[in-house]
Amino acid sequence: MRQRFVDSLDFWRYLFERFLADQGPKSAAALTYTALFAVVPIMTLIFVVLSVVPDFQGIGEQIQGFIFRNFVPSSGAVLQDYLRTFIEQARHLTWLGVGVLMVTALLMLMTVEHTFNTIWRVRRPRRGLSSFLLHWAILSLGPLLLGTGFALSTYITSLSLVSDPYALAGARMLLKVMPLLFSTAAFTLLYVAVPNTAVPLRHALLGGLFAAVLFEAAKGLFGLYVALFPTYQLIYGAFAAVPLFLLWMYLSWMIVLLGAELVCNLSASRRWRRNPLPRLLVLLGVLRVFHQSQQSGQAVRQPDLQRAGWALPDSVWDEMLDFLEREQLICRVSDGGWVLCRDLNRYSLESLLSRSPWPLPHLDQLPESLDEPWFPALRSALERLQRERAALFGDSLANWLQPPLSEP
């Protein structure tokens, strides 16, 4: 029980260290700046897409009201009137103007994707058609899914089971938790679809729930702060809603990125422990998988390593690929896998150690046991190396710095 508690503390410590190392606050500020220019275009595109479907007429107003009512603190009510005016004016734009709005929205989505790829250590971002199709799907199918969800919720609310004064308590509770469910679904979809890598659905769901709960808590605390400390109203007067809205957007992006870090690091089984496995041992384990696959004429992919007992995070897998490809030990094949392109019978361990960016581990860094056939020989060699090192360099430092003069 105590070990599990210590592991949990280590995990959250590592998570926040990664968040700061990935410049989460700086990325949240950049996304806030980008989103500031994309709020009106995205809301306008939602109206435009929903207006294409006759059954969704008028749902855009419901979506806008729902967003400001449940996802923005009460201080955003004044700003909502301004945005509604801007959106009404933008809805009368020509198709050329709508195209400009769409480009603005696409730029924000590209910024989000770049930030997520940085968190997931993705080496190859989407390019060309695949990137355009993803962003187009979000901008076109997203409003339709929102409209369908709101039409369904409106229908459920109209049922006597919910709207009747004697409605079931469970039905009323469902309506109360709907914002949390919508937030969880939105965050989960964001974490699954945007990074250019395979994200386990259960990890994305846990991260989505974490971000949604944190989002609701932050909304309540933010509203409480605005009510108890009305400093912004005293300084900015009628314009107080603008800096408050910017601050809220910044906090929201911080939560989104922190949830992304959680999703990314849920698969990092070893990285957050205080005594992680030395990276050189991981490299030898990966090379053994490549060597075995070469004997059977098979290419290696990341799931093959997981089946062999090496569940590497994407960042570690990418580091291994970078080094092995740079040393011309592996090469990529047409189907996306990797194969050895060098005869390991003609490549010594000494050559690997001299070129590896990861140092030879000390004995106290080795695990007590490791299910690898090469591990006992490596431990024995390190023990012998340590004894020889102690014999060679065991003399006092004073004698090394000022050796005795040799007799004539």
Swiss-Prot record:
TM segment ranges: 33-53, 92-112, 132-152, 174-194, 209-229, 238-258
Classification via HAMAP family: UPF0761 (MF_00672)
CC terms in the record's Gene Ontology section: plasma membrane
Subcellular location, record wording: Cell inner membrane
The keyword Ribonucleoprotein belongs to this UniProt entry's keyword annotation: no
Pfam families: Virul_fac_BrkB
Similarity comment text for this entry: Belongs to the UPF0761 family.
Keyword Transport: no
Origin species: Azotobacter vinelandii (strain DJ / ATCC BAA-1303)
PANTHER family, A to Z: INNER MEMBRANE PROTEIN YHJD, UPF0761 MEMBRANE PROTEIN YIHY
NCBIfam families: yihY_not_rbn
Keywords of the record: Cell inner membrane, Cell membrane, Membrane, Transmembrane, Transmembrane helix
Main location: membrane
Membrane topology: Multi-pass membrane protein
InterPro entries: UPF0761_bac, Virul_fac_BrkB
Name of the protein described by the UniProt record: UPF0761 membrane protein Avin_36810
